[in-house]
């Protein structure tokens, strides 16, 4: 057996470990191999994946969903496309995406931590009213000790410029940041997560044949049973999954 064939065999073992691993790209595959003591260059990994037909097409980018309220007073863009964070729960992103289902549309509203790429809250409903966005935020504050002054960034959709949403952030001592009108790159890391969810899970299914409740379960399981806990995250040290990285970093800082 040639060297590339042996490497490809290891790749298939990695892909077989979890159903969700089937969408591993070159960089995540390289990290997965390194975690098993197999160090290879990106070009070597790419060639082996190409020979084994394991390379994937580029993901589709989801279109923007929320509509700006042009008359509303908007907070400034504080993060200015800087999606890095040195501490957890300090810089958070949110938005809404939709998934077509057999019995309507499912709207998904997450809260994303720039520190480690973790989804710390996920609200879903059959409408995209401001209450959905508010629930996303309040659930996060119930489950996490989010410090005063945490930045919560969104686009300038009417849900996020509503008085109730702003009041909720004020009561939680959060600082609101908002993208410019029509500037999707101002919230690019959140949009990237939606693209990941859809490429790795939603686009693999015909959700128009599934009920809203069935799709809710699929999104929930992907997010909390795979993405947060198992999925290699290339921007984290050693490619650690978001939740694993947060816990590992917390142990080191406490030592």
Where are these regions (language model features)?
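RNase H-like two-metal-ion nuclease catalytic core shared by retroviral integrases
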Residues: 1-2, 65-68, 154-156, 162-166, ...
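Active-site beta-loop-alpha junctions of metal-dependent nucleic acid enzymes
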Residues: 100, 104, 122-145, 161
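Mobile genetic element proteins and their domesticated derivatives, centered on retroelements
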Residues: 11, 29, 45, 49, ...
């Amino acid at each position: 057996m040639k060297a590339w064939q042996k490497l490809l065999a290891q790749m298939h073992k990695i892909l077989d470990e979890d159903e969700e691993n089937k969408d591993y790209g070159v960089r995540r595959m390289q990290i997965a191999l390194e975690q098993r003591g197999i160090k290879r260059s990106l070009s070597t990994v790419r060639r082996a994946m190409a020979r084994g037909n394991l390379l994937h097409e580029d993901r589709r980018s989801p279109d923007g969903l929320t509509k700006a309220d042009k008359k509303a007073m908007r907070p400034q863009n504080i993060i200015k496309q800087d999606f890095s964070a040195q501490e957890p729960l300090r810089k958070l992103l949110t938005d809404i995406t939709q998934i077509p289902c057999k019995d309507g549309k499912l709207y998904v509203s997450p809260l994303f931590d720039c520190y480690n790429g973790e989804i710390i809250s996920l609200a879903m409903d059959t409408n995209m009213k401001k209450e959905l966005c508010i629930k996303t935020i309040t659930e996060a504050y119930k489950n996490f000790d989010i410090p005063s002054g945490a930045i919560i960034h969104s686009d300038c959709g009417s849900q996020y410029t509503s008085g109730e949403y702003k009041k909720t952030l004020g009561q939680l001592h959060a600082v609101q940041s908002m993208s410019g009108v029509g500037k999707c790159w101002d919230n690019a890391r959140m949009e990237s997560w939606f693209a990941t969810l859809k490429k790795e899970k939603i686009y693999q299914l015909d959700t128009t044949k599934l009920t809203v409740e069935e799709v809710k379960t699929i999104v929930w399981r992907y997010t909390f049973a795979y993405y947060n806990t198992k999925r290699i995250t290339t921007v984290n040290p050693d490619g650690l999954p978001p939740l694993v990285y947060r816990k590992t970093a917390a142990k080191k800082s406490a030592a």
